[in-house]
């Protein structure tokens, strides 16, 4: 069969026209070394800081060090299969995590991948883990409370929506217990919770999840877990991932609460990554930007105004403010709050709840030191009735601590001093509260009202908690209407106060405690 040249050229033209070749422009480089979860890559010319880098076996890394002739990246996950000479490619994307309501009730890792065995997550979208915090104009003042359900916190160191309140103390002082109680108390309030576990034992995280499920709190909670067995890079990014998940709710005009448990271990993980990347060490071998590590994270917790929410939702949500409240946890060594990381976080946050080993061992739990604990903005957000009644409690405790030290040396005390000491002992006893038993506003108001007005002055110290429980039960059964009025109004007017006084006096006469 003879083909003339024109037919051959037509066939070639047709083949070229129908060719379905697609070209993709990507920067790729060669892995020069892999050590301790750090890869050095040569040849990535246009890589961004924080960009995801694709490596063999569907493994990703994050570019952190951009040097003259190489890139230093941390590997997210296992790296045993990666070897020198492998190809690494730029993705053009900053690290993102899934966000949305589909994450509620789930346990995920630092990348938002499910680790609870309940199948895939139906996420609304993905958002970068590093985001700029809202500006000054986009914020709104903190004026709504986050009820933790703990008498000692809500009365003395109140937390507002959009606040950053540090929980600080030595190991085994009940820091996590305070945070978990706060999460459990958000049930039914519409506040979504995110619990970020950094560098903890997997068994501890499993216990927390089980307790949240038992108390029906897992329905409004996302757990982000980077356990002690996870790579340092995963522990470093976990708080940022959790923060992004919380910001999703803040930016659609809802309220969220995030617990970072704990940022000391995140700082350790970041120090490890930085030293492996050969960054110059500073104080306590931390890198120079360890303050920025925590400040850029905690500044993202804020109360934002309605204009900001409307702009971000494209007008879909109008007239609603959003908030992200942060409860970072810091572990101290032998009560040393002047160490590098504790001082950094104290200066960034809007107050701190200081937990003491001595108080914990003395059976005062939660072991809150009323003198060192402070809330810089929460007072404006406190429920009116608790604010009205809580001031006396704080004063009684402060005077008691001062007088107790003085009374050790004084042989005979005048009547006024003795009364203050007795009141202080009772208030200290009253601030004790069992774990997983948060109180409502009305229950708290009743307790504070009784102690402020001297109804507990004749009760023996060891019977104070029994008196409180009996009083609560009496009011619930006989005067539920008064309790409902306080709960709904959040205030104590003259008429309600008279009714409450009469009810408490009636209870005292029964003597059933």
Curated annotation (Swiss-Prot):
Alphabetically ordered keywords of this record: ATP synthesis, ATP-binding, Cell inner membrane, Cell membrane, CF(1), Hydrogen ion transport, Ion transport, Membrane, Nucleotide-binding, Translocase, Transport
Compartment(s) where it occurs, according to its Swiss-Prot or TrEMBL record: Cell inner membrane
Top EC category: translocase
Catalytic activity: ATP + H2O + 4 H(+)(in) = ADP + phosphate + 5 H(+)(out)
Bilayer topology: Peripheral membrane protein
SUBUNIT field: F-type ATPases have 2 components, CF(1) - the catalytic core - and CF(0) - the membrane proton channel. CF(1) has five subunits: alpha(3), beta(3), gamma(1), delta(1), epsilon(1). CF(0) has three main subunits: a(1), b(2) and c(9-12). The alpha and beta chains form an alternating ring which encloses part of the gamma chain. CF(1) is attached to CF(0) by a central stalk formed by the gamma and epsilon chains, while a peripheral stalk is formed by the delta and b chains.
Family stated for the protein in its record: Belongs to the ATPase alpha/beta chains family.
Reported function: Produces ATP from ADP in the presence of a proton gradient across the membrane. The alpha chain is a regulatory subunit.
Designated name of the protein: ATP synthase subunit alpha
Gene this chain is encoded by: atpA
């Amino acid at each position: 069969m003879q083909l003339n040249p024109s037919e051959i050229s037509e066939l070639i033209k047709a083949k070229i026209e129908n060719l379905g070749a697609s070209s993709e422009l990507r920067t790729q480089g060669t892995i020069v070394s892999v050590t301790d979860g750090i890869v050095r890559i040569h040849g990535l010319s246009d890589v961004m800081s924080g960009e995801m880098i694709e490596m063999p076996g569907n493994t990703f890394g994050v570019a952190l060090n951009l040097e003259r002739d190489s890139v230093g990246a941390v590997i997210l996950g296992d790296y045993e299969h990666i070897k020198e000479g492998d190809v690494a490619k730029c993705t053009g994307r900053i690290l993102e995590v899934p966000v949305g309501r589909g994450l509620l009730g789930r346990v995920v890792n630092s990348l938002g991948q499910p680790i609870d065995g309940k199948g895939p997550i139906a996420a609304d979208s993905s958002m970068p883990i590093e985001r700029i915090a809202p500006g000054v104009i986009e914020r709104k003042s903190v004026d709504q409370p986050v009820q933790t359900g703990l008498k000692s916190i809500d009365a003395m160191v109140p937390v507002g929506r959009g606040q950053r309140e540090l929980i600080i103390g030595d190991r085994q002082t009940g820091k996590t217990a305070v945070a978990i109680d706060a999460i459990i108390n958000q049930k039914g309030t519409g506040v979504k919770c995110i619990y970020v576990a950094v560098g903890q034992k997997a068994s501890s995280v499993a216990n927390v999840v089980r307790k949240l499920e038992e108390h029906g709190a897992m329905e409004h909670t996302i757990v982000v877990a980077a356990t002690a067995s996870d790579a340092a890079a995963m522990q470093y990014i976990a708080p940022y991932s959790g923060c992004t998940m919380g910001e999703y709710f803040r930016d659609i005009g809802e309220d969220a609460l995030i617990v970072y448990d704990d940022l000391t271990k995140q700082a350790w993980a970041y120090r490890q990554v930085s030293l492996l990347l050969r960054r110059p060490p500073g104080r306590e071998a931390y890198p120079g930007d360890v303050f920025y590590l925590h400040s850029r994270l905690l500044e993202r917790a804020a109360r934002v105004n309605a204009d900001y929410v409307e702009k971000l939702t494209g007008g879909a949500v109008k007239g609603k403010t959003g908030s992200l409240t942060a409860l970072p946890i810091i572990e101290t060594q032998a009560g040393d709050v002047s160490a590098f990381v504790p001082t950094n976080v104290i200066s960034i946050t809007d107050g701190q709840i200081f937990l003491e080993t001595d108080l914990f061992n003395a059976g005062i739990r939660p072991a809150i030191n009323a003198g060192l604990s402070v809330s810089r903005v929460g007072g404006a957000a406190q429920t009116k009735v608790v604010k009205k009644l809580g001031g006396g409690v704080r004063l009684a405790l402060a005077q008691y601590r001062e007088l107790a030290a003085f009374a050790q040396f004084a042989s005979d005390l005048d009547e006024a001093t003795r009364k203050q000491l007795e009141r202080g002992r009772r208030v200290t006893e009253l601030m004790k509260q069992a774990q997983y038993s948060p109180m409502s506003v009305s229950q708290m108001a009743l307790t504070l009202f009784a102690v402020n007005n001297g109804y507990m002055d004749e009760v023996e110290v060891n019977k104070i908690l029994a008196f409180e429980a009996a009083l609560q039960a009496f009011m619930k059964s006989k005067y539920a209407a008064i309790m409902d009025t306080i709960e709904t109004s959040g205030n104590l007017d003259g008429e309600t106060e008279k009714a409450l006084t009469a009810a408490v006096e009636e209870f005292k006469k029964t003597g059933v405690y």
